[in-house]
């Protein structure tokens, strides 16, 4: 199924799906504004919760899925299993309804949302316009998936996997404050002790962070090929087998 092109801009009703981390999050938006949402921080229960959340949003709001204009999904990087589940459900909906698929980078959504709302997250004693924003998604051990954004929400360092050490981000920290956040930031706090290293409170991936980017992509015809789209895993999946247990 090839990507679908729209001839003209209009208000879009979009279902946003975020399953890249331990958070299972879904919302329904029109023109970027949230109409309904469901979210769980229980852990990786996406296979059980995702379709239930979607069905509840539709039923509780008397919403016919055929009214959807597109489905947006968080494309990663993040949990291999979580991404696979979210993308599979999103593609299934797009196939059955004949609507476009939108992919939103998980770190892009986190980084740009936080930069756009910087005064909510940056301490009052710090000039928010001089802060860099560094979302972190937990990988394994001291490794995180990360990127770097300026105060305008522009990406200045591409998405990458980094092993965090005491000198990580030093070229930026020596010049200006950097706000670290996301589910990978907590474990890095002991290593990143530079005076310019700031840490936000709990701020995890959520479908509500996708709204603006998904709506922009819809209006700019930035759609994926439903047949061939794959999540952005960044790294190959590694299954470990400790003793008699199999863990993903």
PLM regions: where:
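N-terminal beta-alpha supersecondary unit
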Residues: 6-75
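Stable alpha-helical structural segments in soluble proteins, enriched in small hydrophobic residues
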Residues: 57-61, 96, 114, 207-218
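Residues at secondary-structure transition points
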Residues: 41-49, 80, 84, 88, ...
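Acyltransferase
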Residues: 200-248
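Surface "functional belts" at beta-alpha junctions
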Residues: 8-10, 33, 100-204, 233, ...
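DPxDG-like acidic metal-binding loop motif
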Residues: 72-106
């Amino acid at each position: 199924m090839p990507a679908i092109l729209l001839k003209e801009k209009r208000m879009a009703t979009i279902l946003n799906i975020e399953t890249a981390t331990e958070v299972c999050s879904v919302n329904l938006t029109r023109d970027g504004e949230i109409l309904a949402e469901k979210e769980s921080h229980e852990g990786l229960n996406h296979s059980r919760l995702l379709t239930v959340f979607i069905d509840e949003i539709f039923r509780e709001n008397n919403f016919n899925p055929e009214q959807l204009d597109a489905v947006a999904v968080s494309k990663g990087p993040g949990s291999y299993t979580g991404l696979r589940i979210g993308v599979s459900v999103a593609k299934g909906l797009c196939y059955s309804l004949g609507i476009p698929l939108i992919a939103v980078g998980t770190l892009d959504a986190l980084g740009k949302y936080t930069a756009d709302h910087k005064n909510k997250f940056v301490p009052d004693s710090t000039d928010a316009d001089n802060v860099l924003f560094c979302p972190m998604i937990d990988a394994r051990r001291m490794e995180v998936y990360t990127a770097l954004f300026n105060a305008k929400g522009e990406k200045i360092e591409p998405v990458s996997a980094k092993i965090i050490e005491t000198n990580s981000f030093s070229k930026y920290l020596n010049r200006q404050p950097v706000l670290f956040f996301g589910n990978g930031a907590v474990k890095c706090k002991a290593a990143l002790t530079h005076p310019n290293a700031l840490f936000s409170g709990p701020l995890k991936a959520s479908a509500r962070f996708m709204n603006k980017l998904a709506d922009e992509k819809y209006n700019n015809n930035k759609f994926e090929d439903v047949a061939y789209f794959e999540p952005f895993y960044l790294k190959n999946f590694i299954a470990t087998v400790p003793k008699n247990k199999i863990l993903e």
